[in-house]
């Protein structure tokens, strides 16, 4: 297994950017892969491109526009408004069926062609917002499936799996990239960079985590 190279599933948001710089500390070569799935917050791809260009990281954007045809949701459809809070039953309408399944599968195909075994993704079960494809059991299951499907030894690493947003901010701080994550990323479902719209679930989670992180710094 090649332990010197890694591929990061990179959206240009807080979590994946933190993982990207975490990976840069641990691996000699890091490649970022992003996806265009006709997301309304497509500005995140510009953030991803800018970050990779600025910090000299090889970057690829793969076309997954068909995802919008298969799974209508509030992140890709202009006629569906993002839920401001999680529903009592079921998943939020911002959940894109099959997104992480497809992202990781396509990245695995890409990784094998590059002779890379390690795939890094910023999913978290602690702050998973009701998304079933952010759970540890899903990642472990998919890891086994990909290994069997391609007769190849992949290792999917999830640095944020068991930490919350405040701890993710602390990780960025410890890595020396707090300002990069705070100012140059896009987490907002409404496509507003940095602090975002302040109203969508992603912005609320990000802000709540940052306020908790600030309390930690003051202690």
From Swiss-Prot:
Q: One Pfam family this chain carries? A: QueC
Q: Where does Zn(2+) bind?
A: 188, 197, 200, 203
| Binding annotation for ATP | 10-20
Q: What is its EC number?
A: 6.3.4.20
User: Which cofactors does the annotated protein need, by name?
Assistant: Zn(2+)
Q: What are the GO BP annotations of this UniProt entry?
A: queuosine biosynthetic process
Q: Which UniProt keywords apply?
A: ATP-binding, Ligase, Metal-binding, Nucleotide-binding, Queuosine biosynthesis, Zinc
* Alphabetized CDD domains for the sequence: QueC-like
Q: Which SUPFAM superfamilies match?
A: Adenine nucleotide alpha hydrolases-like
**Pathway in which the depicted protein is active:** Purine metabolism; 7-cyano-7-deazaguanine biosynthesis
* An MF annotation (GO) of this entry: zinc ion binding
What the entry lists under InterPro entries is as follows: QueC (IPR018317), Rossmann-like_a/b/a_fold (IPR014729)
* Name of the protein this chain belongs to: 7-cyano-7-deazaguanine synthase
State the organism of origin: Clostridium botulinum (strain Okra / Type B1)
Species lineage, top-down?
Bacteria, Bacillati, Bacillota, Clostridia, Eubacteriales
Gene of this entry:
queC
């Amino acid at each position: 297994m090649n332990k010197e190279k890694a591929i990061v599933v990179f959206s240009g948001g807080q979590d994946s950017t933190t993982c990207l710089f975490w990976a840069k500390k641990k691996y000699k070569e890091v490649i970022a892969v992003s996806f265009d799935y006709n997301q309304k917050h497509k500005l995140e791809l510009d953030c991803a491109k800018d970050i990779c260009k600025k910090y000299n990281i090889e970057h690829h954007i793969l076309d997954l526009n068909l995802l919008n045809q298969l799974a209508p949701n509030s992140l890709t459809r202009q006629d569906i408004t993002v839920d401001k809070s999680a529903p009592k039953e079921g998943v939020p309408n911002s959940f894109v069926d099959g997104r992480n399944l497809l992202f990781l599968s396509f990245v695995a195909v890409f990784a094998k062609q590059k002779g890379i075994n390690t795939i890094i993704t910023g999913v978290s079960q602690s702050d998973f917002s009701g998304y079933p494809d952010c759970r540890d059991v899903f990642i472990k299951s998919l890891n086994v499936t990909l290994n069997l499907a391609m007769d190849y030894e992949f290792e999917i690493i999830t640095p944020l799996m068991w930490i919350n947003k405040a701890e993710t901010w602390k990780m960025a701080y410890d890595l020396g990239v707090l300002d990069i994550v705070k100012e140059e990323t896009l987490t907002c479902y409404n496509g507003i960079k940095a602090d975002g719209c302040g109203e969508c679930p992603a912005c609320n989670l990000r802000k709540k985590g940052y306020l908790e992180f600030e309390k930690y710094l003051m202690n």
